[in-house]
Amino acid sequence: HKDVMARILDCMWVPLLEVKPGEYELIELNTKGKHVYTHLDNDRLREGLHDALGRYHASGNVSEEDTRLAREVLRSYGSLRAETDVMRCKIYSLLLSAYKLLGDEEEFTRLHDTMRGMLPVVKAPQSRALLLVTLYGCTDSALYRQMAHEVVDPWRCESSPKKSKQTLIRRLDDYDRWLRHDEQ
């Protein structure tokens, strides 16, 4: 659970309500001083897009429901501007999947090129893994697959990896299975 807080008179924080992950969406970032919103956390959209990509890889088609979900992601995050690489990786991951499902080749190619250009400078391992796993799942590139496994596979040996690492491990395994690379 998280508390949504309000700052009163620059001296006191008061809880407004309590929310669970996935029950809220990032609306805007605080650009003055410390970032109030430090992560993008909407499990319904992230998991929904991932499942939609699975259905797309299985059938080659996109359902009406999956199209609606992809459009919702574009409405919610398409014009959001992030100031940190971590936030950019999260937003771009959502958007690339949405463009793939919608068949928007122009925007997909533009964002793919942007993400590829970010790879050398993104140092945070989980952000780098998110980029690579997303790129692999949306392009079926052997290079992105190899790079994603290089980052993610060592996490499999951790005694209790964080939830975000477990999610990336599962997604990578799903893409290997959906793209028929799990036999290798």
Task: For each feature predicted by the language model, list its residue ranges.
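Helix-turn-helix repeat elements of alpha-solenoid scaffolds
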Residues: 20-30, 59-75, 105-113, 144-147
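TPR/TPR-like (Sel1-like) alpha-helical repeat modules
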Residues: 145-158
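Residues that mark the junctions of alpha-helical repeat units in TPR/alpha-solenoid scaffolds
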Residues: 41-48, 66, 81, 88, ...
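Flexible helix-coil transition and linker loops at the boundaries of alpha-helical arrays
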Residues: 33-42, 75-86, 118-123, 157-162
